[in-house]
Amino acid sequence: MKTLRVAKTLLVLAFASFSSFSFAADQVYTIGVQDYEHYLPYSHYENEVYSGLGRDILDLFAKKKGYVFKYEAYPIKRLNWLYLGGKVDFRFPDNPYWVANQKKGLDIKYAPLLKFADGVLVSPKNLGKGVGGLKRLGMPLGYTPYAYLDLVKEGKITLYENPSYLGLYDQVWSGKIDGAYANIRVAKYYWRKIKGVEALPVVYDPGLPHVSDFHHIGSFKHKDIIDEIDAFMKDESNKAAIEELKRSYKFDPND
């Protein structure tokens, strides 16, 4: 009889452990992210470690909800394929307008996290020359310069991809390209916050076409969690913690 009771106890403990493991496993989600170095304050990927303001905000949400987010970094084109193929649970950053033709048929839900602005960086001596001064336009590998696609189709602009933001800056500064279509805040952050340079070797030209929007987190697999993230970002009780994270990265939404 004692042996039977022990066996029953072990069975109950085993079931409880399995149930706890299953529950814990259900709370782990993969977020596909881009593998850019020097993309701060938004993100930075180096030595297989993904960091930055975007991750800190998402981890703050996850901790509050009892989730665990696992970040998997890929080049943008591969990230698109994995995300749209359902190989990762979420994508960050995402945006309803990005690769919209590839998203047809997918009911993707989005929650906005951080403002961004993409525009053209030029050498200070070329500031104000207008679109006519852009013949060779660089961009990060995997980017789509939506504001310039018509000019590219007309043959007025030739695109050059670079896997490195630092490589783009060098190409602009050396005159190998006329401008670089990139995230404006990222460029300012690198030169001012990391390099400590006030007289920037590459500058944003506001007279050229540019785009402003939000970096969203997107998913078609877990739309309920997207709703939770959206509510989290709007909840006044979370505002102080989120603003503190932004201050730690010197992230000014009006910059």
Write out the residue ranges for each language-model feature.
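Sec/Tat signal peptide C-region and signal peptidase I cleavage site
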Residues: 18-25
